[in-house]
């Protein structure tokens, strides 16, 4: 029986993962696995579309009930991948894409060794900082914390199957499309 491909995108906050995923969903027949988080929604984000936004208590309940494929904390918030739909879609030969932070991606690879892990990297840490400032959603202290986390994430990027530098959005999106088609 054929199975769909499980593609995991990771990378620092502000690198463009969400935009790449949106472009992929517009270009490919692929299912987006919506992550669950305890962080507050950013402007324009909607519950059940961008993330499932839940309280810390609700997230911890999901952990206890075994409803998450993986979970981790990032920047003092929980992030996790609900199990439902992923296996169902893969068994229907429908590929799944998920946007997961580095710790979670490692957990996914243990459960799904055939998963394709793609790390989206910024052209430079300075450019990443400029992007985060340009978003206008965080204080300078929060941005500096995200940069510190990004520097740690960049150190483990070599553990991924592919690394794509997002210095030109169309190029980065096309690279992910080609990886999906050729894997």
What is the predicted role of each segment?
Residues 9:
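Hydrophobic anchor at the beta1->P-loop junction of P-loop NTPases
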Residues 12:
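P-loop (Walker A) phosphate-binding loop of NTP-binding proteins
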Residues 15:
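ATP-binding Walker
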Residues 18:
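Walker A/P-loop
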Residues 26-34:
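Post-Walker A helix-loop "phosphate-sensing" segment adjacent to the P-loop in P-loop NTPases
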Residues 37-96, 103:
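ATP-dependent small-molecule kinase phosphotransfer cores
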Residues 97-101, 110-134:
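Conserved phosphate-donor/acceptor-positioning beta-strand/loop module used by diverse small-molecule
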Residues 114, 130, 134-138, 152-183:
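NTP-dependent small-molecule kinase module
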């Amino acid at each position: 029986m054929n199975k769909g491909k499980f593609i995991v995108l990771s990378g620092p906050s502000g690198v463009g993962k969400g935009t790449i995923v949106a472009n992929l969903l517009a270009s490919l027949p692929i299912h987006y696995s919506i992550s669950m988080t305890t962080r507050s929604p950013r402007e324009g984000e909607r519950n059940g579309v961008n993330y499932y936004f839940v309280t810390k208590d609700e997230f911890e309940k999901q952990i206890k009930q075994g409803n998450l494929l993986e979970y981790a904390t990032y920047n003092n918030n929980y992030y996790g991948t609900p199990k439902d739909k992923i296996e169902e879609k893969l068994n229907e030969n429908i590929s799944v894409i998920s946007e997961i932070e580095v710790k979670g991606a490692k957990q996914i690879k243990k459960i799904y060794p055939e998963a394709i892990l793609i790390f989206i990297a910024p052209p430079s840490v300075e450019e990443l900082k400029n992007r985060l400032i340009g978003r206008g959603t965080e204080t300078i202290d929060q941005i500096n914390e995200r940069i510190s986390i990004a520097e740690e994430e960049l150190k483990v990027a070599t553990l991924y199957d592919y690394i794509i530098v997002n210095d030109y959005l169309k190029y980065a999106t096309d690279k992910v499309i080609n990886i999906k088609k050729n894997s």
